[in-house]
Amino acid sequence: QLGKDYALKEHIILDLPNESFISSALINKELKPNEFNTVDDLVSGFVNSYVPFRNMIFLSFALSIAESNNIDQIFVGFNKDDSINYWDCKENFINHINIISGLNTTIKIKSPFINLSKKEVVLLGKSLGVNYDNTISCYQPIGNVECGCCLSCVIKKEAFNE
């Protein structure tokens, strides 16, 4: 829906093999993502929603598509809260991906929210008139309804309630 609201020119959906990532509760339906009541419950380190090298895989595809279509910028929505448990959401990761892609292209990965908390991103969006009604951050939504207790839901809930 958001793509339509913002007149997105093209939306590409890639079909990736899930069976390679069975250690992640986001892929392996036999595992249930860790549940949290508040962000304070979160401990820095491994959470079972981690998909090994997920963002490197996504960015590799994005770089390939961008180069094939003469696109020189790719934007990602990583924020400071993402980097607590996911190494591939950190500024250092983006910097290194840009170094690697710079060996052959001028394409730049941009991460404008990398130093902002989820709360700061929400406040910025509200100040710009972003409609959050159709957004889902949940790791295990049922239809369009968020679970409310996975890591992503708890971070989002606290960002909107603070």
Question: What annotation goes with each model-predicted range?
Answer:
Residues 11-15, 131-140:
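Conserved S-adenosyl-L-methionine
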Residues 5, 68, 132, 144-147:
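Alpha-helix termination/capping residues and helix-transition junctions
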Residues 1-128:
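ATP-dependent adenylation/nucleotidyltransferase module used to activate substrates
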Residues 60, 134-158:
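Local cysteine-cluster metal-coordination motifs and their immediate loop/turn environment
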Residues 162:
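Adenosyl-5′-phosphate
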